[in-house]
């Protein structure tokens, strides 16, 4: 099955998408209350709309990584002179070369071949916190066809990576949003 990337992730004027920005902001209260002056990695940033909102809320710098080149091009156009960089990268293979205050992965881990491997690699580069948005069924455990229906316990990954669950809230459509802070 091939994904149709002609549609955007975010619904925008003149470009249909699958999600509304306002819906995708649900459950991100902690992130926005704590982003000021922080560096942020947005893994799987789509068109960069949440990255843009983080920069507007005072993030020092936001680095986005997205698989779809058209989305990266649009994100770089939309960001203007905000402190945001966006690059093309496949989160199955891409690894951060530096540390960030906060790492976010919003609706990305369950789409990967090895969510636990990627979660551990990203957590290793987070100085203060990691925010995950996961499907509602069984979170923080992921079981998805894209990872061969194996169970991937993101909670255990975060615990062994030196984080504790600070809060878990519901996002749009009951998605699980977990905020992990460094112990």
Predicted regions and their residues:
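Short secondary-structure junctions
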Residues: 162-170
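Active-site beta-strand termini and strand-to-loop segments that position acidic
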Residues: 180-183
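Short, conserved loop/helix-junction motifs that constitute active-site signature segments
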Residues: 122-126
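Conserved beta-strand signature within the Rossmann-like core of class I S-adenosyl-L-methionine
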Residues: 127-139
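Conserved acidic residues
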Residues: 38, 101, 128
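Short alpha-helix
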Residues: 146-161
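Conserved N-terminal segment of class I S-adenosyl-L-methionine
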Residues: 1-97, 106, 117, 169, ...
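A short SAM/SAH-binding and catalytic strip from SAM-dependent methyltransferases
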Residues: 102-114
